[in-house]
């Protein structure tokens, strides 16, 4: 499989995917380097996944997170996808170079697709105020995309409002030479996998839940896709892609306090995707794109210990964008106008939630909570205008320049709404209501203006090139003026691309979290007989930012081996966390957000791959080995993010020693050393492709907070929070994918694929509790995939 890896001195200052689509727009100082690699790896800060890469990789549920799982700059939270919850199909969180998983920039065709409403709240619990969110605004099906580019370091100035990195997904553009329809079907089910469950978890697993944590012992996943590319007139055409990903999960309908299961029901987890792009090549000077996009996610739940607690939680996002490329005599101008609606919601079947202290439900007696808490949602409408001007390359003496300038304005209309009145109360033994709370119907909004200006120049002299740039951001939410310097230099030592060194310094300011402003609006609709109130303070926050020092090396070894080494050092400053206190006089709970969070991260990767595949008896063999190491220290939990409340602790007890909290290794997304061997075998005459990944992960640690009943608890340090690390063993996993495209069916182009994940059925612990209950990664899993082009 051919991979095109383009030198980063140009691409660090340009949109990589567009540079691939339109090479005339972005001029390259050096010739492109052609390599063959099973899995894309970072090249000077960016990793480009073509549609061919996406087809090759076993992408599991088909989300962008699944695609990036093997990237050496990325770490996943290993507790998200385990043997307990394999029926879930939602995107997983990712951390890039140790940064917050809620501070990545997601884009579609260069327009923001980030959900910054309340991405740290992924709880599926039933409550009057809980609206589950996620940082990916659109739950895209990667099989419908043209390409995806991850910017993890040396990120160009046109990308902002992130701390970790940028992920830009490109929708396919009409191609008159490729008028095809593609149908696809992909499936797996619980009968096709092995689940590794701790003995102490088996009862809850078989009952399908533990409190507000949901398990999936019995599920079926069925994914359907349809895409086409059609010419409508001369120089005018359309592409479209539709998909439905559905997981049907059988869970307990009700479980009594004694653990008695009273029937089971089927619950659906669905993600729908619709993408379309109309393209008009109006002339040699003008090209227009009109893009339509939609994703809708819904998840059915009940709380198995609450009768009548059925609810639907989900996300709906849709938008449109118009792009116009104009070729001027001396420059290229791109203008983009877009609108995106991103929303999260919780809709209960009932509007009243109450608890009877003594009740009977069917054959079950005891304490009975039941009901629901109505319909609540929050959303943001983003109206975007952006423009960018790329000058043609010109020379001043022996130095060439290619500057570009850009501006962007986004108006964000954020709102939260309770669609109907609901209430909660307790019925005591005397049959009277107590603890009565009313949640009033209401709607409130925030309007935010976001302004951006940026400029950069590509400067080249002989075999040295520089990319200085600067970005300015301002918004009236936190009212901070943020200036981000970006700089990169590349040296082609022998001027023949056999030895190249890249280095740079960059600053990345993060995005806003809108829920901090919406929370008081939502809480104002609550009337409690106790008179309790809540107040949120966030207005004096600084914008969190990351400073980056990075270096990259590329070396050609002999005639056919390419080695790449990358080092990234990140310091995260002014990270948001919170503290809470209660004013007893006014019965007000005050939540105050602060900038006390900080982390330091060292990230290193090394890869070896071939410039040309090995040819043995009509078989192309593409080997690749990748080493990656990421280690972070800091005073906040990446999973908790801006809801972290421990950053005010100057000292803690860690593994028996009283230490500074910010010297403690970060516990989540903690998979420091990973080594993977990727090997593809392609037999062109038969149409067989066998792709393999053998991955080893070093032993790592799970963080446990000690209580007074734990043996390791030190009573003389009772004034401090105490933590201990428990070792989790190293792991070796083998994932394989076998695809067959029968050569005798050229007209239909049928492809049948089978994925086997964790072929060795390794039992890998990913977490443990202070009582010693372990959680394990999924065991061996089979997927079947069939597609046809015609």
What are these regions (language model features)?
Residues 123, 298, 476, 494-544, ...:
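Surface-exposed extracellular loop regions of Gram-negative outer-membrane beta-barrel proteins
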Residues 22, 39-156, 166, 170-172, ...:
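Periplasmic N-terminal accessory/gating domains of Gram-negative outer-membrane beta-barrel systems
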Residues 275-298, 311-478, 603-613, 617-628:
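Face-selective signature of the C-terminal outer-membrane beta-barrel domain
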Residues 179-180, 213-298, 315-332, 397, ...:
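Transmembrane beta-barrel wall of Gram-negative outer-membrane proteins
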Residues 460-465, 567-576, 583-708:
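Gram-negative outer-membrane beta-barrel transporters
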Residues 1, 5-60, 65-72, 134, ...:
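N-terminal Sec signal peptide and the immediately downstream disordered periplasmic leader
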Residues 116, 687, 695-714, 731-733, ...:
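C-terminal beta-signal and adjacent terminal beta-strands/loops
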Residues 181-189, 240-244, 290-296, 335-341, ...:
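Transmembrane beta-barrel strands of outer-membrane/channel proteins
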């Amino acid at each position: 499989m051919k991979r095109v890896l383009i030198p980063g001195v140009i691409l660090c200052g340009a949109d990589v995917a567009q540079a691939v689509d339109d090479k005339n727009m972005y001029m390259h100082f050096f010739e492109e380097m052609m390599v063959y690699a099973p899995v894309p790896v970072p090249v000077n800060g960016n990793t480009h996944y073509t549609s061919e890469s996406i087809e090759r990789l076993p992408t599991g549920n088909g989300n962008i997170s699944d695609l990036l799982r093997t990237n050496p700059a990325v770490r996943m939270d290993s507790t998200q996808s385990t043997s307990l919850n394999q029926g879930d199909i939602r995107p997983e969180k990712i951390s890039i170079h140790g940064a917050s998983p809620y501070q990545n920039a997601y884009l579609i065709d260069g327009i923001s697709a980030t959900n910054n409403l309340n991405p740290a709240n992924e709880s599926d619990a039933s409550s009057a105020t809980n609206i589950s969110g996620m940082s990916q605004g659109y739950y895209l099906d990667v099989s419908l995309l043209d390409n995806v580019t991850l910017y993890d370091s040396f990120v160009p100035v046109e990308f902002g409002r992130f701390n970790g990195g940028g992920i830009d997904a490109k929708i396919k553009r009409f191609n008159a030479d490729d008028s095809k329809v593609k149908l696809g079907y992909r499936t797996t089910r619980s009968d096709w996998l092995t689940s590794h469950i701790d003995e102490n978890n088996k009862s809850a697993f078989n009952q399908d839940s533990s409190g507000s944590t949901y398990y999936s012992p019995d599920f079926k996943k069925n994914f359907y896709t349809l895409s086409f590319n059609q010419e409508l007139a001369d120089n005018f055409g359309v592409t479209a892609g539709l998909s439905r990903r559905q997981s049907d999960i059988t869970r307990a309908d009700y479980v009594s306090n004694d653990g008695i299961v009273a029937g089971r029901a089927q619950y659906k987890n669905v993600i729908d995707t619709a993408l379309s792009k109309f393209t008009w090549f109006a002339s040699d000077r003008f090209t227009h794109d009109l893009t339509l996009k939609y994703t809708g996610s819904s998840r059915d739940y009940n709380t198995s210990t609450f009768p009548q607690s059925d609810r639907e939680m989900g996300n709906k996002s849709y938008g449109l964008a118009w792009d116009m490329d104009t070729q001027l005599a001396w420059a290229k101008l791109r203008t983009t106008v877009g609108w995106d609606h991103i929303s999260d919601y919780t809709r209960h079947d009932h509007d009243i939630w109450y608890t009877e202290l003594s009740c009977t439900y069917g054959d079950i007696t005891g304490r009975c909570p039941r009901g629901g808490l109505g319909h609540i949602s929050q959303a943001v409408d983003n109206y975007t205008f952006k423009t960018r001007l790329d000058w043609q390359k010109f020379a001043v003496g022996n130095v060439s320049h290619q500057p570009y300038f850009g501006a962007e304005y986004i108006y964000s209309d954020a709102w939260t709404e309770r669609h109907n009145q609901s209430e909660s109360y307790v019925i005591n033994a005397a049959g009277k209501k107590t603890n009565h709370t009313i949640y009033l119907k209401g709607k409130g909004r925030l309007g935010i203006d976001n302004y951006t200006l940026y400029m950069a120049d590509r400067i080249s002299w002989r075999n040295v090139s520089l990319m200085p740039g600067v970005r300015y951001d301002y918004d009236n939410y936190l009212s901070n003026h943020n200036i981000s310097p970006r700089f990169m230099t590349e040296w082609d030592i022998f001027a023949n691309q056999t030895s190249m060194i890249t280095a740079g310094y960059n600053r990345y300011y993060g995005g806003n979290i809108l829920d901090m402003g919406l929370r008081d609006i939502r809480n104002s609709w609550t009337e409690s007989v106790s008179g309790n109130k809540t107040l949120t303070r966030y207005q004096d926050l600084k914008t969190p930012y990351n400073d980056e020092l990075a270096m990259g090396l590329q070396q050609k070894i002999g005639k056919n081996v390419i080695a790449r080494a990358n080092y990234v050092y990140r310091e995260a400053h002014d990270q948001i966390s919170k503290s809470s206190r209660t004013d007893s006089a006014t019965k007000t709970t005050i939540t105050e957000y602060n900038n006390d969070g900080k982390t330091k991260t060292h990230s290193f990767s090394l890869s070896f791959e071939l410039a040309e595949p090995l040819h043995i008896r009509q078989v192309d063999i593409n080997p690749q080995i990748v080493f990656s190491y990421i280690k972070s220290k800091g005073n906040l939990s990446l999973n908790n993010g801006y809801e972290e409340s421990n950053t005010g602790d100057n000292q803690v007890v860690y593994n028996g020693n009283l230490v500074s909290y910010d010297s403690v290794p970060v516990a989540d997304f903690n998979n420091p050393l990973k080594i993977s061997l990727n090997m593809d075998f392609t037999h062109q005459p038969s149409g067989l492709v066998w792709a393999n990944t053998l991955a080893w992960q070093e032993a790592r640690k799970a963080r446990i907070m000690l209580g007074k009943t734990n043996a390791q608890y030190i009573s003389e340090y009772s004034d401090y929070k105490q933590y201990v690390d428990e070792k989790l063993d190293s792991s070796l996993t083998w994932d394989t994918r076998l695809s067959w495209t029968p050569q005798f069916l050229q007209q239909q182009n049928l492809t049948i694929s089978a994925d086997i994940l964790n072929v060795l059925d390794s039992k890998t612990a990913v977490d443990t509790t202070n009582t010693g209950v372990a959680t394990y990664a999924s065991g061996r899993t089979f997927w079947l995939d069939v597609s046809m082009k015609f």
